[in-house]
Amino acid sequence: MRAKGFTLIELAIVIVIIGILVAIAVPRFVDLTDQANQANVDATAAAVRSAYAIATVQAKGIPTCDQVFANPEGGSTSGSTWTSSDNSTTVSCNASADTFTISRGGKTRTLNLTVN
C-alpha cells in the first residue's frame, strides 16, 4: 500500500514559491498605501484651498482659521487644527490663517495661501 501525502521536496518548493510571492507583493502594497496617502493629502489640500476662497469672500478679507474650518465635513475642529472623523488626516492652520499643513500617513503638504 502506497502512503498518500506530499514529499518533503514538494512542500519545500511550495514554501519557496509562497516566499517569492510575498517578497514581490509586500513592497507593492506599501507603495500603494503611500500613493493613497499622498492622494488623500492632495485632495484635502484642494478642499482647503476652496474653503479658504469661500471664507475670504465671506470675511471680505483675510479669514481666520475658524472661518476656514467653519463647516468641517466628516471631522472636528479643535483650535487651529481640523481632524478627520477617522483620525487619519489633520489640517493645521497658523494664527494668521495663511499657512496650512496637511498630514496623513507620513505624507505632509504645506499650503501658503494669500488674498489678492
Curated annotation (Swiss-Prot):
PTM description: Glycosylated.
Membrane topology label: Single-pass membrane protein
Observed effect of gene inactivation: Deletion mutants show a defect in twitching motility while DNA uptake seems not affected.
Propeptide segment residues: 1-5
Keywords from the named record: Cell inner membrane, Cell membrane, Cell outer membrane, Membrane, Methylation, Periplasm, Transmembrane, Transmembrane helix
Subcellular location: Cell inner membrane; Cell outer membrane; Periplasm
Entry keyword Nucleotidyltransferase: no
InterPro entries, alphabetized: N_methyl_site (IPR012902), Pilin-like (IPR045584), T4P/T2SS_Core (IPR050470)
PROSITE patterns tied to this protein: PROKAR_NTER_METHYL
Gene Ontology CC terms, in alphabetical order: cell outer membrane; periplasmic space; plasma membrane
Residues bearing the modification N-methylphenylalanine: 6
Function: Plays an essential role in forming the main structure of the narrow T4P pili that participates in twitching motility.
Stated name of the protein: Type IV narrow pilus major component PilA5
GN (gene name): pilA5
